[in-house]
A protein has these predicted regions:
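Active-site neighborhoods of metal-dependent hydrolases
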Residues: 190-200, 257-419, 512-516, 520-527
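C-terminal cap of metal-dependent C-N hydrolases
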Residues: 452-509
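Active-site gating/metal-coordination segments in enzymes
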Residues: 172-222, 249-250, 275-295
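Metal-associated gating/positioning segment near the N- to mid-region
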Residues: 85-161, 179-185, 238-244
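Histidine-rich, glycine-flanked metal-binding segment
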Residues: 24-38, 47, 51-104
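Divalent metal-dependent hydrolysis catalytic cores, especially in the metallo-beta-lactamase
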Residues: 126-147, 164-174, 195-207, 216, ...
Length: 527
């Protein structure tokens, strides 16, 4: 997915000097969360480290300030715990009994747009949905609210003066320029200027090859990261293999990968009447793209996947954002929309020729069938890449195509499971792999001594059922024969600050209800 439609108009002119959309109000000062404390001990939990190791417990996790200082096994499973084997609580400390609970690292969402004027939602709404789903770190690819705004929010989050995940601002290539970038030196100057303004990396859709190569080279020199959505307007010149060679950190979605796998053709098989600015046409034809790529075992496939692995390249597939293309009714009627999808966001989702990602003008079984086959090939490549040692991360791109913030991220975990990932591999993709791709694995991504206390606490086992991470929980038939809801995140801990996840969800429901009351409606309208 992409940022504003204005960016695409400029892409069509091969200029790519995007105009920033109007920035939304910054988040209010923090009133939520308790801590950090001189010492906080989480008692008796089962731990999922995020490294790929199996769960173990009971464990006491000791946090001092914002850091994990001890991860101590305090007994055997299903056996009494000897108090003498437990870390002592210091004066002024706090302890939380988490017997029967699970603790995992905070989720790293590698593709999280904070939203903007187009979506009509506030930063508070987005941040609280993220934190309520255990998302403690988010890369904003593009900084659609402006680099100054995004960098400011990142600083405020780092200081914990707002209720928000930690933020990693990646500026959109060319943003802030009055005119298009036309030389490699201008690209280098732009990279340096963005770093000075607080950007940690760059997001691009493509560009003239010599200019884009210079930008990637300068990013490397400046120690910055990069993300690329290889849009169709430039992918014939620069596909994922080219940008990976230039030093691209992560590819977003799937664009550029099938094109790198072409054998016997050099461009997508576009029909003669194809128009990129007709989004149903664009995404309809995209559903036929993986069928044009070389298959596993072919010489071309093996050459491409081998080189990407050798380059240490990262895939950020964002399966979730295209899920509606294979099952529109399911996406449109997801149970969380009623309470958690803001009416203004719903307006943006409604089919429209003007709102990006709202391209379901006449989307039927033929398009969905193409995309179901597309997903099979796409998922097979991603799983194969992981199995051969490649890094795969979790990104949601919510705020488009019926994807609500927070919920879309958990859907991505389920889709990685569908692709063939073991639940522990899903957890690693959602935590440590994202931290590694951001160059932040020394601080976040796993439950280890010395790392920041970014943790998620659940009353249910997410390895047995990823659905317990949804804010709406999971329906289970109780012992009394009545269906009941279980799960949902209990606490999200960021920098040692403990957030009550259900309370954050109540705040979001209140925001949504208030907007509905203003409109005089109780339900989101369906077409």
């Amino acid at each position: 997915m992409t940022r504003p439609m204005r960016c695409f108009a400029l892409l069509a002119a091969f200029l790519l000097a995007p105009l920033a959309q109007a920035a939304i109000p910054a988040a209010p000062e923090r009133n939520e969360g308790e801590g950090p404390w001189p010492q906080l001990i989480l008692r008796g939990a089962t731990v999922i480290t995020g490294t790929g190791s199996p769960a173990f417990g009971p464990v006491d996790i000791v946090i001092e300030g914002d850091r994990i200082t001890r991860v101590q096994i305090v007994g055997s499973a299903n056996a009494p715990i000897d108090p003498e084997n437990r870390p002592a609580l210091k004066q002024g400390g706090r302890e939380i009994d988490l017997s029967g609970h699970y603790v995992m690292p905070g989720i790293v969402d590698m593709h999280g747009h904070i939203g903007g004027d187009e979506q009509g939602v506030t930063a508070e709404y987005v941040y609280k949905l993220w934190l309520a789903h255990g998302i403690t770190s988010v890369r904003d690819p593009g900084c659609g609210n402006g680099i100054e705004w995004c960098a400011s929010e990142a600083k405020r989050s780092a200081a914990n003066t707002i209720t928000a995940p930690r933020l990693f601002p990646y500026a959109f290539f060319g943003m802030g320029q009055d005119d298009p970038i036309t030389t490699p030196e201008q690209a280098r100057q732009w990279v340096r200027s963005m770093k000075a303004k607080g950007a940690l990396g760059m997001k691009c859709f493509g560009y003239r090859p010599d200019i884009l190569e210079a930008a990637f080279d300068e990013l490397r020199k400046q120690g910055m990261g990069s993300a690329c959505h290889h849009a169709q307007l430039d992918v014939a010149r620069v596909n994922v293999l080219t940008t990976a060679r230039w030093g691209l950190t992560t590819m977003e979605h799937w664009y550029g990968l099938p094109e790198a796998l072409f054998d016997g053709q050099t461009v997508q098989q576009y029909p003669a009447d194809y128009n990129y600015m007709d989004e149903q046409h664009r995404f309809g034809e995209a559903g036929k793209l993986w069928a044009q790529a070389s298959e596993k075992g072919s010489e071309r496939y093996e050459a491409v996947i081998t080189e990407l692995l050798e380059l240490g390249f990262t895939l950020d597939p964002t399966f979730t954002i295209y899920q509606a293309t294979r099952d529109l009714m399911r996406a449109r009627t997801a149970e969380w929309h009623a309470d958690y999808t803001h009416p203004a966001l719903w307006d943006f989702f409604t089919p429209s020729r003007h709102n990006h990602g709202s391209f379901f003008f006449d989307w039927g079984s033929e398009q969905e069938t193409d995309w179901k086959h597309n997903y099979q090939r796409w998922m097979a490549f991603v799983n194969d890449y992981k199995n051969r040692g490649g890094r795969v991360t979790v990104g949601s791109d919510s705020g488009y195509i019926y994807k609500t913030y927070g919920f879309g991220t958990i859907e991505e975990l389920e889709l990685l499971r569908e692709a063939g990932f073991h639940p522990l591999e899903v957890m690693r993709a959602a935590t440590l792999s994202g931290a590694e791709a951001l160059g932040a694995e020394d601080r976040i991504g796993s439950i280890e001594v010395g790392k920041l206390a970014d943790l998620v606490v659940l009353s249910e086992n997410p390895l047995a059922n990823l659905k317990v991470l949804y804010g709406t929980g999971h329906i289970r038939l109780g012992e009394n024969g009545e269906p009941t809801r279980v799960g949902g995140v209990r606490y999200t801990i960021k920098d040692g600050i403990v957030y009550d996840a259900p309370a954050l969800l109540r705040d979001v429901r209140a925001i949504v209800a208030e907007e509905k009351a203003k409109r005089g409606t109780e339900e989101l309208p369906q077409p």
